Amino acid sequence: MKKVYATGRRKASIAKVWLTPGAGTMTINGLSLDAWLGGLEAKKLRVKQPLALTKQDTSVNIVATVLGGGFGGQADALRHGISRALVRFNPELKAILKPEGMMTRDSRVVERKKPGKRKARRSRQFSKR
């Protein structure tokens, strides 16, 4: 029985993903996908996207631990981790996932606040007179 491990990242979130051949169950932080994400349907679809594209949704079991960030970052980190695990499980799937951008780590992070400004770029209100 082949067990594959991969890590996915997005913003401040890190997803540790273990993938094994099985019936298609998905456990995240000890919960099912529906219990973990609740009513966030768009994020559920995003997490399932690599499995749907490669038609592996009923042939692999996924156990994942996700840390840090919010639900959006965690869902995208999990998607990245699942994609990387699928490619380690079956290298032929890279040809499907790479053009869809699922193998690429989204490196966008929050820009830091600068001194003398209210936010990263927002300046204080300027009064000409």
Swiss-Prot record:
Region Disordered: start-end pairs: 104-129
GO cellular component, one term: cytosolic small ribosomal subunit
Biased composition (Basic and acidic residues): 104-113
Keywords: Ribonucleoprotein, Ribosomal protein
Coiled coil residues, start to end: none
Keyword Magnesium: no
GO molecular function: RNA binding; structural constituent of ribosome
Keyword Secreted attached: no
Compositional bias segments (type: Basic residues): 114-129
InterPro entries: Ribosomal_Su5_D2-typ_SF, Ribosomal_uS9, Ribosomal_uS9_bac/plastid, Ribosomal_uS9_CS, Ribsml_uS5_D2-typ_fold_subgr
Any single biological process term in GO: translation
Lineage: superkingdom: Bacteria
HAMAP family: Ribosomal_uS9_B
Family under the similarity heading: Belongs to the universal ribosomal protein uS9 family.
Name under which the protein is recorded: Small ribosomal subunit protein uS9
Organism: Sulfurimonas denitrificans (strain ATCC 33889 / DSM 1251) (Thiomicrospira denitrificans (strain ATCC 33889 / DSM 1251))
Gene designation: rpsI
